[in-house]
Amino acid sequence: MKSDLARSIVSRPPGVRDSVTVAVVNFHPVWGENNIRRIREFAESAAGSGADIIVFPEMALTGYDPDPAEAGEKRMQLRLAETVPGPSCEALKPVAAHYGAYIVFGLPERDGDRVYNSAAVICPEGRVLSYRKLHPFGRENTWCIRGETPLLVTTPWGPVGIGICYDSYQFPELVRYYAARGARLYINCTAQCANMQHGDGRTRFEHYYLTTLAGHVVANEIFVASSNLVGLDNTTRFPGASMILGPGVRRQAGLEDPYYRIYAGDIADCREEIIAATLDLSLAERTLYRDNPFTGVPDFRPELYARLYRELAAVQAGQ
């Protein structure tokens, strides 16, 4: 008999829609506190053009790059951190409600004396949710702490998973967890820098960014919507390249087809803009989580991986 988790992996709730229009924004933040008006304008434009889900980059609310001259509570990310819900979420709620859209944007989130690198999710019916980055990268650890909980957003298209930048590129466990729990769409809010005009900058960025996102599509048979910063943010240059990827064709006759397709966007898109595509989520078949017709059980083996990770955790703890 299948467990509740196994049933959730393979089942599809009744009434779930397949067709969804997703918009990702190449967004150039003004360093500091002047971005919410422009986020709202972009959200209204995308939603007015039919977008159901609108995605902004990591730290879109304030800008990403820290000022090395600032320390302690004077750091921009700490000074401008907001609660979720908070003022910026409230500013976007009318847009989400009017257009029936979901809006996702990155910000420094304050919860008491703690600050997180977060993605806020504004839902059309008024819910406001927060995903807190599980793996802060490098200098981010000087102003934020680790999140502890994945976020699956309940939508008319089934559960949608949220991740932020380093979570997506170096830790494939998060995307796999979401796909195993039924997500057919993964949202990546990112601030991935690169100097595309310098030496092998474009090649390195493409290998790290596009190759990794495409790998998630192939490995998990889900769609990925990635929104990146663009332009000069304080002293760091961001290349944009926001894009939407997904399975290219339906699997047929029991044959595997590890093909991916870029539905919208390009690695060379380096200007501020909205990039949108209408997706058929029925292509996200997530075959490895379903019963293999030759064995009667899924190829996906979480009980095995749990044992392996317990061994790794014990080693890391010095046991």
Where are these regions (language model features)?
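Conserved beta-strand and immediately adjacent loop positions that scaffold enzyme active sites
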Residues: 21, 104, 118, 149, ...
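Residue-level recognition of beta-strand->loop/alpha-helix junctions
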Residues: 26-28, 57, 65, 132, ...
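CN hydrolase (nitrilase-like) catalytic-core segments centered on the catalytic cysteine
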Residues: 81-102, 169-273
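C-terminal beta-strand edge segments of enzyme domains
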Residues: 2-10, 223, 229-319
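N-terminal active-site segment of His-dependent metallophosphoesterases
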Residues: 1-53, 187
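Active-site catalytic loop in hydrolytic enzyme cores
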Residues: 5, 110-212, 260, 276, ...
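Cys-nucleophile CN-hydrolase/nitrilase-fold catalytic domain and related Cys-dependent amidase chemistry
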Residues: 36-127, 192-215, 219-222
